[in-house]
Amino acid sequence: MDVKGKTAPVTGGASGLGEATSRRLHAAGANVMIADFNRQNGEALCKQLGARAAFAEVDVTKTETVKAGVDLAVKTFGAVHILVNCAGSGWVGKTVDKQGPHDLDTFKKIIELNLIGTFDCLRWAAFHMQNNQPNEDGERGVIINTASVAAFEPQMGQVAYAASKAAVVGMTLAVTRDLARSGIRCCTIAPGTFDTPLTALMPQPMKDGIIQHIPFPKRFGKADEFARLVQHIVENAFFNGETIRLDAAVRFPPK
């Protein structure tokens, strides 16, 4: 699918990997709907991008804001062709420690944000995508979700995060098969450790400890490297039903 002229909501689109994706798709000619709960950052980015950019205040744990955001993209730009799910968060907490078992409400919140939020966004986007006119390959839409290498090699303390991201990986092929008749593709990217505002807060010794486990290149990923893969998935119609690791071959140990 050609990015130019297509409409792409990006959840978590005002910071980190989502911001890089918003910028790259916009530069490639897409209409970008920055869907984020941070209004200040979202509107500031929208202003920077200028024409073909809009902002929707979306909390992916609240389905009414998800539906409103997708509806706004359709109202503003006429259709939805691409969805990139970047909204999500992590949490550090072991299954049990000396103080007691993992807090169940926290576990549920991470699942609600990373898994249910992802599914809620894609179901509303797909509902609109199925009405698009197909291109020469019969494509009507492309959905790209974000998982994590923690879905495959979670470290200690990542039980909630790993469960949520592994579930995103697990539903990728199921969603793909559900949407195939509608001409909608679905892929997932599982990134390793990337330079984002969150990792910028890490102390340098912690960063060095992570980098020592990365075979090559021995650095954190750049947000635009994630965004470039997003663009390639959109443009390559044979990418479908796959989870792609973007991690410089890292395989993290338990801790």
Annotate each language-model stretch with its function:
Residues D2-M33:
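Canonical Rossmann dinucleotide-binding motif of NAD(H)/NADP(H)-dependent dehydrogenases/reductases
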Residues K67, K75, G90-K108, F127, ...:
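Conserved mid-core segment of classical short-chain dehydrogenase/reductases
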Residues L122, S164, T172:
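Active-site helix of classical SDR
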Residues F127, T176-D178:
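Alpha-helical segment proximal to the catalytic Tyr-Lys
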Residues S148:
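Residue(s) in the substrate-gating loop at a strand-loop-helix junction
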Residues E153, Q231, E235-K255:
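Short C-terminal tail/terminal secondary-structure segment
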Residues P215-F226:
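A conserved structural motif in NAD(P)-dependent oxidoreductases
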